Amino acid sequence: GRIILPFTLLRRLECVLDATKADVLAQADKVATMGLPEEAEEKMLLRAAGLSFFNTSKMDLGKLGESGIAANLESYVQSFSKDAREIFEHFKFTEFIGQLGDVNLLFKVVQKVRTADLSPAAISNHEMGLVFEELIRRFAEGSNETAGEHFTPRDIVRLTTSLVFMEDDDALTKPGII
C-alpha cells in the first residue's frame, strides 16, 4: 500500500511537467554553464517550468529501461527540485526502490505506473486530490489503523460545515448560546 502512493505522485508530477520539460532541459543546460549558486539555479529552473517544481532529467518513467532501473529511477527522482525531492524522502522512496529491485518487481511496477494518464487534462487537480485521499484512506484501513486518525471524508466535512453555517442566524446570536 505504501508503495502505490509515491509512485502515483511520481507519475502525476511527470505528467504535469510534460508540457514544459523541453524548456526546463534547455534552461538547465544554460544554467549549468553559468556557475551560479544552487539557489539561483533552482529559481531559474522554476521560472522555466512555470510551476513550483521541476525535473532536469532527460529520462522519464518510459525511458528508464530494465537494466539498471533502480539506479536510473533514483537518478530520475534526484533530478526533481529540492521541495519535490523532500517529499520522496519522506516517503522513504529509495528504500522502496531497493525492496522492489531486490524481488525483481521494480521494472514491472514502473511499467504499470507509466501507462496511467495522470495529466491535468485527464484528471483535474481536485480529482487528483480525491484520488490521493482515497489511497490514503484505503492504506490506513489496510494497516489496521483507524482511518479517522488520518482522513476525514469530504461528505463529513461538508455536513459539519453546513451545520456550522446554518441559516438559523438568530439562534446563534442569543446571549449564552455559544
Provide a role label for each language-model segment.
Residues 170-178:
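Conserved class I S-adenosyl-L-methionine
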